[in-house]
Design a protein with these regions (language model features):
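Eukaryotic alpha-helical solenoid repeat scaffolds
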Residues: 1-5, 10-15, 21, 26-224
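Acidic, serine/threonine-rich intrinsically disordered low-complexity regions
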Residues: 224-246
């Protein structure tokens, strides 16, 4: 994609550039980790230069959707390249541009979860593309232990904050999904990055955010009992000030 094409007002120009990129990525040519980094550096610049909310939203969705158009043997490398560049560039994103990059990260989290939803088979081997995507998440935005401090906190916070939202968006919290053994196992694997962060992160804020995310009422087992709400209301009424009695 040529510099500036993502910022042109006409959508057809952006679409042609993205189609050309998709064709390139789908070719038989093998790409190296350096190729993916160069590619995502260019895509980062395109988003950086993209003005106005609607084009930004469209571009963020289009860039993330490239993942689903790739041959399976290129998905993990492409996904890793995105997170490596975001880790490298995050702290130079100014406040005026941050919102569109938060959206871009949200779209990439969602598409990564789609890959896991459709491809994770329970075999925790990196050759499995769903497992490979989850390992990228654990090694970069949700990293704990050695190297954790090199991951920008803002990026980490955002990923934790949106994780359950995007799980819900891609349908991984539907009752007919989590009601199966496969669905339960898949969800447990997808929640593992948060569990690791809650337990082992060196950053207290990260630990607390992960704890809050894992306590989300949308997750199985966290549903709030309607009777508990009633009991809380009654307790508050008892504790509340009832006015001055005559």
């Amino acid at each position: 994609m040529k510099k500036g094409e993502a910022n042109k007002p006409d959508k057809p120009t952006r679409d042609r550039a993205l189609l050309s990129l998709q064709t390139y990525l789908s070719s038989a040519r093998a790409l190296t980790p350096l190729d993916y980094l160069k590619l995502h550096s260019g895509l980062f610049y395109c988003m950086w230069m993209c003005d106005r909310p609607l084009p930004q939203q469209s571009l963020a969705s289009s860039l993330a959707s490239l993942v689903l158009s790739l041959p399976k043997n290129k998905i993990v490398g492409f996904y890793r390249g995105f997170w490596e560049i975001m880790k490298k560039e995050w702290e130079r994103i100014d406040v005026l541009r941050m919102e569109k990059f938060l959206l871009l990260v949200r779209r990439y989290v969602a598409v990564g979860l789609e890959v896991v939803r459709d491809n994770w088979t329970g075999e925790e081997e990196e050759e499995n593309v769903g497992e490979g995507v989850l390992r990228v998440v654990e090694e970069i935005p949700c990293r704990v232990g050695e190297g954790e401090m090199r991951v920008p906190n803002g990026m980490k916070f955002h990923v934790v904050d949106i994780w359950v939202d995007e799980l819900e968006r891609v349908g991984m919290l539907e009752e007919d999904v989590v009601g199966t053994e496969e669905g339960k196992a898949k969800l447990e694997r997808v929640l593992r990055p948060l569990r690791k962060m809650q337990k082992d992160s060196m950053n207290k804020i990260v630990r607390n955010k992960a704890k809050d995310a894992l306590a989300d009422e949308r997750l199985p087992g966290n549903e709030k009992d309607a009777n508990s709400d009633k009991d809380e209301d009654e307790d508050e009424a008892k504790d509340g000030w009832g006015g001055i009695e005559d």
